[in-house]
From Swiss-Prot:
A GO cellular component entry from the record: cytoplasm
Source organism of the structure: Burkholderia multivorans (strain ATCC 17616 / 249)
Name recorded for this polypeptide: NAD kinase
GO molecular function term, any single one: metal ion binding
Gene3D superfamilies tied to this protein: Probable inorganic polyphosphate/atp-NAD kinase, domain 1, Probable inorganic polyphosphate/atp-NAD kinase, domain 2
Superkingdom classification of source: Bacteria
Short name of any one Pfam family annotated for the protein: NAD_kinase_C
Major place of residence: cytoplasm
GO BP term, example: NADP biosynthetic process
Catalytic residue positions: D75 (proton acceptor)
Assigned protein family: Belongs to the NAD kinase family.
Location of this chain's protein in the cell: Cytoplasm
EC code: 2.7.1.23
Length: 300
């Protein structure tokens, strides 16, 4: 059905294995459908909550058919569907039904008021970058993955430090003994990288940050690189080393394996309500400015 709006078909994606998510998803679907939009569900979401009356699609089918995806869940849900829809440039709207909610910025209590307004074309749009990584073993690529937040090379919980050789654009950077190394996007700079004393990168900054995890030498500090950098991390020493992609998929590594990381050609459009402020998100999520303030988020 044509609505005369920027969007016609809206996909709904929900957080897996979450008690109480069926009712808000059904409510949101009805709220959107009665305004003339076609509503489809991500297949696993539809099966899990037992909803009928709407098409149930794979992520690839959503990418080909939907104009926008509304995600109800936590940051992990947003990361997972974002990676799958990245090749299709499907815009995402995030509704927080998790704990932290750095990138799912709409409160569930506000979704019926805000989402229809956004679907009518009133929103703020930004592009979020991704990383692509491949593992090379004996000169041959053996694994490839996208990451929205970060690519993390780290040891298992029962092994000692690992030694990693890092180079950038073919130039040697250092050998580092540590618990691992994080390669993060600006979006991922407020995830694992932040807990390892990495800097916060504004999402619109074109950069990639390398953050050591518990390095043996305190002089091994985080460094922000240009986002067109090509990063190579070789496993020089250690055992039980893994590489994780957004902490949602991983593979075991062997000595002399190399992880090659670069910015992906794909970006994911995030849609926010009018008046969205990244700094307000930081204040709320990181508990900045705990004392009352008369300041607001209006541009001066």
């Amino acid at each position: 059905m044509k609505t005369g709006n920027l969007f016609n078909t809206v996909a709904l994606v929900g957080r897996s294995n979450t008690p109480g998510i069926a009712e808000p998803l059904a409510t949101l679907a009805a709220c959107i459908a009665k305004r003339g939009f076609e509503v489809v569900f991500e297949g696993d979401t539809a099966r899990e909550i037992g909803i009928s009356g709407y098409p149930a699609l794979t992520p690839a089918e959503i990418g080909a058919r939907a104009d926008v995806a509304v995600v109800l869940g936590g940051d992990g849900t947003m990361l997972g569907i974002g990676r799958q829809l990245a090749p299709y440039r499907t815009p995402l709207i995030g509704i927080n039904h998790g704990r932290l909610g750095f990138i799912t910025d709409i409160a569930a209590a506000d979704m019926q008021a805000l989402v229809p307004v956004m679907l009518s074309g009133k929103f703020e749009r930004e592009e979020r970058s991704l990383l692509e990584a491949r593992i090379v073993r004996d000169g041959e690529p053996i694994y490839h993955a996208l990451a929205f937040n970060d690519v993390v090379v780290n040891r298992s919980g029962f092994s000692g430090m690992v030694e990693l050789r890092a180079s950038v654009d073919g130039r040697y950077m250092y050998n580092q003994r540590s618990d691992g190394l994080i390669v993060a996007t600006p979006t991922g700079s407020t995830a694992y990288a932040l807990s390892s004393a990495g800097p916060i990168l504004h999402p619109q900054l074109q950069g990639i940050v390398l953050v050591p995890i518990a390095p043996h030498a305190l002089s091994n500090r985080p460094i922000v690189l240009p986002d067109d950098s090509k990063i190579a991390i070789q496993i020089v020493g250690g055992r039980d080393v893994n590489v994780n992609f957004d902490m949602q998929s991983f593979t075991a590594l062997e000595l002399n394996d190399t992880i090659e990381v670069r910015r992906s050609k794909h970006t994911v459009p995030f849609l926010h309500p009018i008046g969205y402020s990244y700094y307000a998100t930081l204040r709320k999520k990181l508990h900045w400015n705990e004392h009352a303030s008369n300041e607001d988020d209006k541009a001066s």
